[in-house]
Amino acid sequence: MAVKKKVSWRSLIVGCLGDPETLMASSKKPKRKNDVIKKQSSFQRLSILDMSNPSSNTLSEDLSISLAGSDLHVFTLAELKVITQSFSSTNFLGEGGFGPVHKGFIDDKLRPGLKAQPVAVKLLDLEGLQGHREWLTEVMFLGQLKHKNLVKLIGYCCEEEHRTLVYEFMPRGSLENQLFRRYSASLPWSTRMKIAHGAATGLQFLHEAENPVIYRDFKASNILLDSDYTAKLSDFGLAKDGPEGDDTHVSTRVMGTQGYAAPEYIMTGHLTARSDVYSFGVVLLELLTGRRSVDKKRSSREQNLVDWARPMLNDPRKLSRIMDPRLEGQYSETGARKAATLAYQCLSHRPKNRPCMSAVVSILNDLKDYNDIPMGTFTYTVPNTPDNKEDDGRVGNKPRKSSHHHHHQQQQSNHPRSSPSPTTKSPSPTAKSPRNSTENHRRTLRNGVNSPLRSEAGGERY
């Protein structure tokens, strides 16, 4: 729960990349005398750091200085080859905007002080500067922020042109994978509320840190789950320092994922902690309904989840229409009503009307303990209609690729239930199961780090 005092990474990022977002925003503000002095001093530091060239000989040294006191390990490429068996295809987990991800295992003999453990090794594709910036941002944030609901960054490699990140391995993969895989066992109500509470706690920690952080890319595929379904936020490539002093927001280029980004952020580029609250409301709505934030396979009026479901969230008589049918009625009605009301508030078009994350965490903490869940055994059959056919992990005639670290190879899910487990009919032995198909492990949930507003599950880019 403790956070190590952050050295300011802002000057480091600016030195590395020229930070066009921040520079553009600051140019719009009235220049005060003190501002000019500070900027001159800042630019003197930039010329020293000057990490705009990813192959800079001083990059590794600058990072080591900036992250002094952190417990990050700086791996060599040779060590990573040992950990991943030379990046063997048998250890391949997936590939996304950052590049391929491999599972690995750190032996306790690799180096003193590093315990034996499974890891996920993400290799960055450095063809574009954008990727380097996200890699650097992730190292800086996760190197200094420590919390049980943030994924642990164990270390990194910055050797010649190679850029890698080494994370703790998350055996349950992402919430996106657990919630939307067609043939996976349905997440029970209690587990969904546990995940929502954990993810909300992670956001609260970021917003209330000594130097507040705006996550900016909160979505189901960025919520990773350990073996006990503890939620941990991952992928800090788009994270930003919160507003400073009397500023009410951060002005920045619009980036994120369609269906999750707050409407005022899309319209104005003004980013606040309440922008994250809106995104949380979308994920909470996904947990309630079992639907994606954007689903082009549905009818036109139901493709955007928020537009379709939000009007019904505040009406108890209509709530049952939007609840995930795979829950088969086994959820707390009182808890569902309170969760729906919370989602409604988080999704307000007026940022000031959204609750802060501490209030969200408090409400969800109570919801975890509701035990008025109906008992009984049910069978839910997936309708075999054209609208519900799985797309076999393909977009057009091309197979999708799996998201990077978010989609670790999945273990068989045995979800804990607070009531007898309903039986879900399995596909016939002759049917092709997406779980076992190669394409299923190569889905791309991020359409590239260079997209201003990335699409999710087939959504349109802005």
Curated annotation (Swiss-Prot):
Catalyzed reactions: L-seryl-[protein] + ATP = O-phospho-L-seryl-[protein] + ADP + H(+); L-threonyl-[protein] + ATP = O-phospho-L-threonyl-[protein] + ADP + H(+)
Modification O-UMP-threonine, positions: 252
Modification sites for Phosphotyrosine: 167, 265
SMART domains per UniProt: S_TKc
Residues carrying Phosphothreonine: 76, 252, 257
Claim: Transferase is one of the keywords in the record: yes
Residue numbers annotated as active site: 217 (proton acceptor)
Outcome of gene disruption: Reduced leaf width. Enhanced disease resistance to the bacterial pathogen Pseudomonas syringae pv. tomato. Compromised pathogen-associated molecular pattern (PAMP, e.g. flg22)-induced oxidative burst. Mitigation of the higher virulence of EPD1-deficient V.dahliae.
Post-translational modification: Autophosphorylated. Autophosphorylation is reduced in presence of the Xanthomonas campestris effector XopAC/AvrAC. Uridylylated at Ser-251 and Thr-252 by the Xanthomonas campestris effector XopAC/AvrAC. This conceals conserved phosphorylation sites in the activation loop, reducing RIPK kinase activity and consequently inhibiting downstream signaling.
Composition bias type Low complexity, residue spans: 410-435
Induction of expression: Induced by the microbe-associated molecular pattern (MAMP) flagellin (flg22). Induced by the Pseudomonas syringae effectors AvrB and AvrRpm1. Induced by 12-oxo-phytodienoic acid (OPDA). Down-regulated by UV-B.
Positions where O-UMP-serine occurs in the chain: 251
Location of the protein in the cell: Cell membrane
EC numbers: 2.7.11.1
InterPro entries registered for this protein in UniProt: Kinase-like_dom_sf, Plant_Ser_Thr_Prot_Kinase, Prot_kinase_dom, Ser-Thr/Tyr_kinase_cat_dom, Ser/Thr_kinase_AS
Functional summary from the UniProt entry: Serine/threonine-protein kinase involved in disease resistance. During Pseudomonas syringae infection, and in response to the bacterial effectors AvrB and AvrRpm1, RIPK phosphorylates the host target RIN4, which subsequently activates RPM1-dependent effector-triggered immunity (ETI). Seems to act as negative regulator of plant basal defense responses. May play a role in pathogen-associated molecular pattern (PAMP, e.g. chitin and flg22)-triggered immunity (PTI). Required for the bacterial XopAC/AvrAC effector-triggered immunity against Xanthomonas campestris.
Family label: Belongs to the protein kinase superfamily. Ser/Thr protein kinase family.
This protein's name: Serine/threonine-protein kinase RIPK
